[in-house]
Amino acid sequence: MDVLKKGFSFAKEGVVAAAEKTKQGVQDAAEKTKQGVQDAAEKTKEGVMYVGTKTKEGVVQSVNTVTEKTKEQANVVGGAVVAGVNTVASKTVEGVENVAAASGVVKLDEHGREIPAEQVAEGKQTTQEPLVEATEATEETGK
């Protein structure tokens, strides 16, 4: 019977040793799996961050392009508006001058320049000013 007990004792020790080795193997595999999952998660995070950064750069570049195009168009429209306003203002001034001259409110000399009211009252209807070609410089300075 001792032999039988001894045999069971060896078997028991073998099973315990096998169970311990299996447990250690499972723990090692679980640790490696956990590390693998962590590595995969880190790589995924890096990939997502890279894609996010590239997307952000693309959006910023697109916004900057749209901003520049909008500024260019605003400048074009602004220039056209200024030119239009200047044309309207010039035509308005011409119209007022024509109405004033036609109604007799203002007297003009032979060159189309206004004769001051004092000279009209005194009978002097000529001016002593030399003729000056109208240019932007003369219009700005008034000379």
UniProtKB/Swiss-Prot annotation:
It comes from the Eukaryota. Nervous system tissue. Found in the electric lobe, the brain and the spinal cord. Residues 113-143 are annotated as: Disordered. It is found in: Nucleus. Keywords: Nucleus, Repeat. Residues 20-78 are annotated as: 5 X 11 AA tandem repeats of [EGST]-K-T-K-[EQ]-[GQ]-[VA]-X(4). SUPFAM superfamilies: Synuclein. GO terms for molecular function: cuprous ion binding. The keyword Nucleus applies. Gene3D superfamilies: Helix hairpin bin (1.10.287.700). One of its GO terms (cellular component) is neuronal cell body. Three isoforms are detected: 17.5 kDa, 18.5 kDa and 20.0 kDa. In the neuronal cell soma, the 17.5 kDa species is predominant. May have a role in synaptic regulation or signal transduction. This is Synuclein.
